[in-house]
Amino acid sequence: VITGMGALSPIGNDVKTTWENALKGVNGIDKITRIDTEPYSVHLAGELKNFNIEDHIDKKEARRMDRFTQYAIVAAREAVKDAQLDINENTADRIGVWIGSGIGGMETFEIAHKQLMDKGPRRVSPFFVPMLIPDMATGQVSIDLGAKGPNGATVTACATGTNSIGEAFKIVQRGDADAMITGGTEAPITHMAIAGFSASRALSTNDDIETACRPFQEGRDGFVMGEGAGILVIESLESAQARGANIYAEIVGYGTTGDAYHITAPAPEGEGGSRAMQAAMDDAGIEPKDVQYLNAHGTSTPVGDLNEVKAIKNTFGEAAKHLKVSSTKSMTGHLLGATGGIEAIFSALSIKDSKIAPTIHAVTPDPECDLDIVPNEAQDLDITYAMSNSLGFGGHNAVLVFK
C-alpha cells in the first residue's frame, strides 16, 4: 500500500501543489532558463519553479550532489514525513530504498569534462564519480534517512520510475522489507542532454508553449523535457495497519517486458507495451473491463503515441472504448526516469480523490488516436483500478496497476 508521497515537478514543489495544478490543467512548460539554448533547435522544457536547494540541504552538502540526487532527497523527505514513517534503530533494517534515474549526473559530467579539458586531470573533483552514477540518489537518500533495508537502483530510461516502484513492490510482497522508499528522479536540463536528445530527433522543436507538448494530437513533433522527482513510501498492509498509517491506494499489479526491437523506436503495434499491460493485469488478477483509468506514457512523439494507442486497443479490446486515458506529460513535460514516480502519484490520487487529471493542449485530435484522452479539463470518476504505463528507450516497458 502507498502511505506517503513526495514530489518536485514543473507544476509544483510538493505533492499538494503538483496535484492541484494537474487538476487545473496548469502548463508547466516554458522557455529554458537553466542554459543558453540559442545554439539549439530546442528552447522549451518543464523546469522547476522558485526552487532553491539551499532551503532544503546544507550548501556544502548540496555541492557534493548532482541535481538529480538533490531532487530525490527533497521528495523522499516529503514522502517519509507524509507517511509518518519512523526510521529508527529498531525499524531501519526493514525499510529500504529503490530510486532510479534514467541518465544520472549529466550536469556533473559536463562540468568535470570541461575541467579535464581546460585544466588537466588533477582538477577533476574526487566527488565526480559519486555525483555521476545513477544509483547515488538511492545511496544518498538511504544515508539521509537512515534506511538500511534492501537498497538499489533500476535504470530503464523513461521506464525507470515505474520499474523502480514495481521492483520495490515485489520486495515488499516477498517479505524482504516492511517498507520501501521508491520512485524516480531526473535533472536532464543540461547542454549534453538537450543536445543528445535533439540529435536523436526525440524532442519537439516547436517554440509555442501551448502546442509543443500535445500528446495524441495532429502535428505533434516530439517530447518536451522535464525535471524533478516522484517518490512513494510503499509498505505491507500489515505494517501500515499496525502503525495506523494513512493509505492512499494499493499497488496490486506490475508487468515489465522488453521489445527486443530497436534502441529508440517502439515495437510495431506497441506489442511490447501490450504484453506489459497484460502482465500487470494478470499479476493483479483483473481483466481489462475492471480498469477505469490509464495514465498513458503519451510523450507527444508521432510514433510513440500512435503505438501506445494501438497497444491499449490490442490489450483492452472493446473495453478501450470506455477507458479514460490521459497524458499528464502535456503539463509536466517528460521527466524521463522521474516520470513514472510522478505518474504513480497521479494514478494513486486519482483513485483517492475520484478525479482524473486531463490531457491539455487537446485541440487538434489525431483521428488515429481515438481514445477518450480526457481533453483539457479534469473529470470526476469513481475509480476501482488505475493503470500507469512507462515505455523507455531500449525497448523497456513497465506497467503498474493501482487499486
UniProtKB/Swiss-Prot annotation:
CDD domains: KAS_I_II
EC number annotated for this UniProt entry: 2.3.1.179
Pfam families per record: ketoacyl-synt (PF00109), Ketoacyl-synt_C (PF02801)
Coiled coil: none
Occurrences of domain Ketosynthase family 3 (KS3) (ranges): 1-403
Catalytic activity, reaction form: a fatty acyl-[ACP] + malonyl-[ACP] + H(+) = a 3-oxoacyl-[ACP] + holo-[ACP] + CO2; (9Z)-hexadecenoyl-[ACP] + malonyl-[ACP] + H(+) = 3-oxo-(11Z)-octadecenoyl-[ACP] + holo-[ACP] + CO2
GO CC aspect terms: cytosol
Family label: Belongs to the thiolase-like superfamily. Beta-ketoacyl-ACP synthases family.
UniProt name for this protein: 3-oxoacyl-[acyl-carrier-protein] synthase 2
Lineage: Bacteria, Bacillati, Bacillota, Bacilli, Bacillales
